[in-house]
Amino acid sequence: MDLFMSIFTLGAITRQPAKVENASPASTVHATATIPLQASLPFGWLVVGVALLAVFQSASKVIALHKRWQLALYKGIQFVCNLLLLFVTIYSHLLLLAAGMEAQFLYIYALIYILQIVSFCRFIMRCWLCWKCRSKNPLLYDANYFVCWHTNCFDYCIPYNSITDTIVLTSGDGTTQPKLKEDYQIGGYSEDWHSGVKDYVVIHGYFTEIYYQLESTQLSTDTGAENATFFIYSKLVKDVDHVQIHTIDGSSGVVNPAMDPIYDEPTTTTSVPL
């Protein structure tokens, strides 16, 4: 308890003018230098503040977040909490160092610093994934993989949990009312309609890039689901430069990443001859 109270009441480090003692004119080598430290801010209240932020951060995970601004707000709070945790760690480390109690907590601080480095590296990797996907979604969602396709109008990036042999993309049919609330859905994630789908999609991960080719479509009348069209993609084992595709007119060609989407809008009449 005494050790806890001594840490809880530590203050901020304020450097005072230093002085040199025991220095005689005849001896310029042997001297004692002292740098007084003054506590001016209670360290304990800062710990309480960070603890409250951590509780708020954990409580926010219980609330379902669906809108992008809610996800952005949550990630912003999480980022601020991580910065405050890093500040408190360095701040308390300096205080314990000044109080001569660093040795008792050296291993704990080493572990905290390692975790902070891992968190920072993860943030850098998510930024790199954003660059690969041309989207901010990797910073908003915690998924390991993202299904991406790019059109002239929009860069689609939908979170995906694992690598599978088949990807099923659910879309509103564009003709029947009422339409689906979200136009493109994969699993529990969705993306609003901005442009059409393409012959292929790509799964991006930290060290993963897997291409999937459109194999078939299933309409609402085939599945019994209302107002929905299902685009089924299968994993490719061929080289990317020699991927054969099937277009609306039945001709085959080579996948061109810059090509226009073959579906301007998913409709009940959309089909792909195989």
Swiss-Prot record:
Topological domains annotated Cytoplasmic: 56-78, 126-274
PROSITE patterns noted in UniProt: COV_VIROPORIN_3A_CD, COV_VIROPORIN_3A_TM
InterPro entries: a/bCoV_VIROPORIN_3A-like_CD, a/bCoV_VIROPORIN_3A-like_TM, Protein_3a_bCoV
Glycosylation sites: S27, T28, T32, T34
Extracellular side of membrane: 1-34, 100-104
Record note on modification: Exists in both O-glycosylated and non-glycosylated forms. The glycosylated form is associated with the virion.
Domain CoV 3a-like viroporin CD: residue ranges: 145-237
Misc. comment: Bat coronavirus 279/2005 is highly similar to SARS-CoV (SARS-like).
Domain comment as written in the entry: The second or the third transmembrane region are responsible for Golgi localization.
Record-given protein name: Protein 3
Organism: Bat coronavirus 279/2005
